[in-house]
Amino acid sequence: MEAASLHVQMHTASDPFLSHAALNNNNTMNKLNSAVLSQGVKDEHDNNDKLSLDSDGTTLLKDTSSGHGGNDGSHMGCNQESNDDKPLKQKRHRTRFTPAQLNELERNFAKTHYPDIFMREEIAMRVGLTESRVQVWFQNRRAKWKKRKKQTNVFRTPGALMPSHGLPQFPSSMGDSLCSFHTNDTRWPPMPAQMTSGPPLTLPPTLPRQHTGIGQSLSGHQGGGGGMNQSPNGFGSGISVTSNGSVQPSMYQSFGGGMSSMSSMSSVSTSSGLPSSPTNVTVNSPMSCSSPDTGDMWRGTSIAQLRRKALEHSVTLNGGFR
């Protein structure tokens, strides 16, 4: 008993923390602390594991998403820069003009095709449009007008579409019709005068009976009275008419079987009471081909003499009919 009490006294007297109760309490506290620490360590490990899982899963996804987001941002930045570099294409709005506006614009276009800035502004105020719209309308209208004018000029000039053969117009007077037509067309061969003789021409009954000799049909070699050969086309041919009634033989060209009507100069002059003049009227055309024996006679005459003689012959014929 004494030993136990001594032992207790020794422990309690020396230091209260060195007693068994205190030591036991300290041991329990240490155990509790160690348990708490171990529990805390376990909790930390669990938390670390959870963080690692989260980092493997969600955090990485966040990083990847942030990375993608960064890439998207960079791409968007590049696109914005490229869009800033390229000018934005504006949508073109087609202007619809009312009939009243078109009438006003057409009326001003009839006045001038090139209005100045002041006139365009005045027109824009009247029709309720902008000056730029009015300017564009005038530009389009001028282009349309030039195109239409060009087309009309092309259709008006037939020489631009088809070649011109340069055929002269038929003259009105008898002398011009006999002598002024010249051509180098040699497609038709010459025909003798005997083959071109046609049926006799008849005169209306109103003319006197003494003029019936005009309608007689005579060939170039058989006719006794001098006259004039006439083709249906109105072209003159090689004829030599003298006052004594002799007809020089000639070969001329006929288109589609011409009519040959020869009138007597002597009968015309006698019936009209005019003296017969010794004028030798000769009508020749470059289209006719003279016979070889009369070539020298035709070669010596000139165009001026032929026209003058043809005119005298026409005056003589007109005087005879009067």
Swiss-Prot record:
DNA-binding region: 90-149
GO BP: neuron differentiation
Annotated stretches, region: Disordered: 41-93, 210-296
Short motif (OAR): ranges: 301-314
The entry's keywords: Developmental protein, DNA-binding, Homeobox, Nucleus
Stretches with biased composition (Polar residues): 55-66, 239-249, 278-293
Subcellular compartments: Nucleus
GO cellular component, one term: nucleus
InterPro entries, per database record: HD, Homeobox_CS, Homeodomain-like_sf, HTH_motif, OAR_dom, OTP_Homeobox
Signal peptide interval: none
SUPFAM superfamilies, alphabetized: Homeodomain-like
Primary localisation category: nucleus
Family statement drawn from the similarity comment of this UniProt entry: Belongs to the paired homeobox family. Bicoid subfamily.
Name of the protein this chain belongs to: Homeobox protein orthopedia
Organism: Saccoglossus kowalevskii (Acorn worm)
